[in-house]
């Protein structure tokens, strides 16, 4: 039995009655032990122990509340947190810096930024932990500009300050800003000591690198870890696996996974299984799952099965998907989450089993959410099932009235069947409601710099050269037999205008830039925010053969690995 567990075991009414003379020191230890052993079954909450302490007329000291306040960490706990704050004021402990920082963290965790700001403003001398707490509070709340303003006002900063803001940028989806801030952290600053990133900083930066496909920057972070002999534990190892896989370097991800050796746990296995699923390597997924559950005797968790079911989706393996879904429940006692149900609906839809998908949704023990209806909409769109599309869209709009993707999907179904009046009506409805279509966007990294391209982009410094290169590429493709797949243009245009519209998709601009800027034979890695269209998919296959380039494209669904004229997805995506 651990020391903390032993303390909790004795924290009972008999113990208290027999020891009426307990000092605050021992009460504080009991409170801290309960808070730190949240996963253990307990007969007493921290607040009940505090109240019992007060019943014995023992006064709290400046250690009591920093131990007690972390037990209030979500909006439901706010009333208790406020009453505890009143106790702090009653005993005159509100000026203590440790108590003040704990109050800031409590209000932040409970989502009460106004009270957190008030505690900060009322502080006479604001120490570094208080500054860090308030910056973290705004960053976690998504108010990243306010967090940055406070960060810039700080009289001094440490690794926690930088890490809080970098993590805030990542949480807000501002990955380039996160990497820019990390680079700023490395620069020498007048009158400020050099701040070395810690494990949390590096795992956060690796996440940003993965999102942007910034492989070179991710490799630099890995080299930094090795240079300073930072131990690659499960958290950092999993972050490296995820980064390398998302950047299109699966072999490096595998090397990190294998290097973990005996440290591999369910998190590491789940990360690797999810990575293999993104690449459509279903057989390797199944093999690794078997190794995990038999050779290493590690039980899978819900994340593991999200990866396994995702692998089934990418290959359209309906029987295997149903088998693993059943195994999850019956063999491992895991209650399916909405993500698991979403995978199954997606699997049924991609397999053309729309009626089965609808029956499966009807059998769910929870209300279907945006993920479920979106999966049904996507599957029925692939089959041109307009009636099911319309029904799914109606449910989606009820749950998320501003979901542009739903409108666009239905509009695309109408466009493919030539129902231009319905397309016009949907676009008019989007305009009236102020719903904007998410533009196609692609990222590439060249010489350590991430470049962003949007459809029809002319903002690049070398736009003229990029478009000239793209024209040259398309001419070579046409000479090799390429014919534009104009059915992918879901606009009421003539054939010539459709060809022009297709030629300026963001991934085509990105590949032209890479062919212009990199040496022959250099692999090309592109991150796309939307699903790659059929015409761009065909273009990538042909470029990989004609220009002898390995091309890796990560779209919103999966990875496409183009080599010598073929794709790893086998044209199923």
From Swiss-Prot:
One record GO biological process: RNA modification
Signal sequence residues: none
Residue numbers spanned by region Type E motif: 372-447
Matches recorded under Pfam families: DYW_deaminase, E_motif, PPR, PPR_1, PPR_2
InterPro entries the record matches: DYW_dom, E_motif, Pentatricopeptide_rpt, PPR_At4g14850-like_plant, TPR-like_helical_dom_sf
PPR repeat residues: 23-60, 61-95, 96-126, 127-161, 162-188, 198-232, 233-263, 265-295, 301-336, 337-367
GO molecular function, one term: RNA binding
Type E(+) motif: annotated span: 448-478
Key words, A-Z: Repeat
Renumbered residue ranges of the record's region Type DYW motif: 479-573
Family the entry assigns: Belongs to the PPR family. PCMP-H subfamily.
NCBIfam families: PPR
Name the UniProt record assigns to this protein: Pentatricopeptide repeat-containing protein At3g62890
Species assigned in the record: Arabidopsis thaliana (Mouse-ear cress)
Gene this chain is encoded by: PCMP-H82
